[in-house]
UniProtKB/Swiss-Prot annotation:
The keyword rRNA-binding applies. Part of the 30S ribosomal subunit. Forms a tight heterodimer with protein bS6. Binds as a heterodimer with protein bS6 to the central domain of the 16S rRNA, where it helps stabilize the platform of the 30S subunit. PROSITE patterns: RIBOSOMAL_S18. One of its GO terms (biological process) is translation. It comes from Geotalea daltonii (strain DSM 22248 / JCM 15807 / FRC-32) (Geobacter daltonii). This is Small ribosomal subunit protein bS18.
Length: 91
């Protein structure tokens, strides 16, 4: 049998990631802000330009409010307050 070893990772200097401040859920921080499917202006903040719902790790929402946001966006799409496709599809 041959004495081949799996390729090893380089042991060079590691790149340090810049420290990013942890995002805070805007709905937990300000209790007066509510999630409402009838308010498309608020919901558009959580939709990408292609029409996808922005994930929690990017938006900074907590799990509870991310679920509520997702449900509100889907309801708003269902009654045509928000487009199903992104804004680029209208062009």
């Amino acid at each position: 049998m041959s004495d081949e070893r799996a390729p090893q990772r380089s042991t060079g200097p590691r790149k340090k990631r810049p420290f990013q401040r942890r995002k805070v859920c805007r709905f937990c921080a300000d209790k007066q802000v509510t999630i409402d499917y009838k308010d498309p202006r608020t919901l558009r903040y959580f939709i990408s330009e292609r029409g996808k719902i922005i994930p929690r790790r990017i938006s900074g929402n907590c799990a509870k409010h991310q679920r509520e946001i997702t449900e509100a966006i889907k309801r708003a799409r269902n009654i045509a307050l928000l487009p199903i496709a992104g804004s680029h599809a209208a062009q």
